[in-house]
Amino acid sequence: MTIDNPSAFLKTLPTGSGVYQIQDAQGKVIYVGKARNLQKRVSSYFRRQLDSKTQAMMAQVQSIQTTITRNENEALLLEASFIKQFRPRYNVLLRDDKSYPYLYLATHQKFPRLDFYRGAKKAPGRYFGPYPNAGSVRENLALIQKLFKLRQCSESFFKNRTRPCLQYQIKRCTAPCVGYVNEQEYRRQVEDAILFFEGKNDQVIIKLTERMEVASENLVFEEAAHYRDQIRQLRRLQKQQIITGGKGNIDIIGIAESNGAIGFAILFIRSGRMIGHKPFFPNTPLGTTLQTALVEFIPQYYLSPLRNGDIPERIVTSEPLEDRLWIQRALSSGLNRRLAITDQKRAPYKQWQAMAALNAAQALSQHLAQKNTFALKLEAIQKSLALPNPIARIECFDISHTLGEATVASCVVFGEEGLIKKDYRRFNISGVTPGDDYGALRQALTRRYVRLKEGEGILPDVLLIDGGMGQLRQAAEVLEELQVSGVILTAIAKGPGRKAGLEKLFVWGRREEIHLPADNIAFHLIQQIRDEAHRFAITAHCNRRAKRRVESTLQEIEGIGPKRRQKLLKYFGGLQELQRASIEEIARVPGVSETLAKAIYDACHQHKG
């Protein structure tokens, strides 16, 4: 509703719960909020005394739309949904992130495999985590291999071994592939590992002690020594690991503020063990309080599909949480599970709240320092290339193919905080003469900038092309045809002998080449962005080429017609999932024998890489 008469408008608002959208003159949603009482909450924006952030927002208001909900819980869930949909500039916005990695134990296998895993939890077995990053997963994977010697190899590798691999020689596996350990003994290793993951180290030590004593009584001293070493490693690990004293799964959320910026750090407690922490730096409007940031962060984070259903039993915050019980009830309802939220600083969480806040402050300090460094580098590019305006965003394009096969264009984005990977795009090129780099570049640029003109993204200040004046001319023609203005066009071409450091730079509209010193900070950043575009293009090209060749090879397998090929892809949800599947998993597809499954598996891995 348009606000010509605020007093009359406020009287029309309902007094029940709901969500309100504040819109500007262009009809764009600039803020989304929830309320127990819509009339009372919206009225608060029309008071005389407002903080600077709210004053700036209200100066742009053209209309306010309201949505009535059945209860407060629905209001909070709908608010989170609208924030994700509209990305309003005056809300705290949590950036999209990758899904979290896990350790996956294939317990359905005769000799279960333990491995790194990221994605939807579709395969049968046990998932342990989530871990804050890939590094912590690999660290724990190495630890489990050292302690319990579980195999990590693929099914194909496992079934085709005739002698132990290097993992056995360095005592990271008991070589079930060649029968050095029987199924019963290997299952004991698996059970010990599961107890360890569940934080039941004491139970593992008791079991190992019993086995050590039996081995010693039977005069099997080498086996007894092995159990003794395992016990020592576990005891040493217990001293090093931070234990909460509880047995549940808890997230401790720390928050910190510096120079108007706000950062979060979440400590992940799983089965009583802290398995790591992860920092977050959401887009936060200037003047946002810690309490407001916390209230907006928590629903966005825990209602995101990237959580993959992994919600702790308890959330602990380092700062008081406004509407704590409301948020607790709404999240429990939306996630369909009981969830407790604690914000009081008392035992046993007090030390964890302090640690989380300290981690948030440290991470925010490093983030701001890095951001300042990137800002200086962008300023250096502006000065070195004598550009008229400051730079906040650069896009770089590159083309990759193998003799014209599976051509792919990449677009990478760099901003004031470094590489913006969520904005990367790749374009599968079609309908262009194989090997025609100009045609491929024109197609990619056209597809990209048509979308940007339609509002699907942000126009860059600088467009960087990996190539020379020919490629730069193609870019200029495309942007002129699309009537895109305000973007400075540049290119980086290889120098004599294709040697790094001798590259030439071009700016559209200037005749002369630009040669920057090899130690120039701006030159280094341009090279870094170009190399990232090259890496992204090659990776996408290799994947597309491998996919095409696998599809072609599948067509050549006797017994795989169009219907069965479609059935396979539908069963696994796509070619990538089929390529990840083991022979056993492929053989589970109705109508696929073990012999045919092996042929399919071999075809999928023939062109890998």
Curated annotation (Swiss-Prot):
GO cellular component, one term: cytoplasm
Keywords tagged on the record: Cytoplasm, DNA damage, DNA excision, DNA repair, Excision nuclease, SOS response
Gene Ontology molecular function: any one: excinuclease ABC activity
InterPro entries associated with the record: GIY-YIG_endonuc, GIY-YIG_endonuc_sf, GIY-YIG_UvrC_Cho, Hlx-hairpin-Hlx_DNA-bd_motif, RuvA_2-like, UVR_dom, UVR_dom_sf, UvrABC_protein_C
Subcellular localization, as worded in the UniProt entry: Cytoplasm
One Pfam short name: UvrC_RNaseH_dom
GO biological process annotation, one example: nucleotide-excision repair
CDD domains documented for this protein: GIY-YIG_UvrC_Cho (cd10434)
GIY-YIG domain location: 15-92
Keyword DNA repair: yes
Residue ranges annotated for the UVR domain, each copy included: 202-237
Function: The UvrABC repair system catalyzes the recognition and processing of DNA lesions. UvrC both incises the 5' and 3' sides of the lesion. The N-terminal half is responsible for the 3' incision and the C-terminal half is responsible for the 5' incision.
Subunit (UniProt): Interacts with UvrB in an incision complex.
Database matches in PANTHER family: UVRABC SYSTEM PROTEIN C (PTHR30562:SF1), UVRC/OXIDOREDUCTASE (PTHR30562)
Family: Belongs to the UvrC family.
Full protein name: UvrABC system protein C
Organism: Coxiella burnetii (strain Dugway 5J108-111)
Taxonomic classification: Bacteria, Pseudomonadati, Pseudomonadota, Gammaproteobacteria, Legionellales
Gene: uvrC
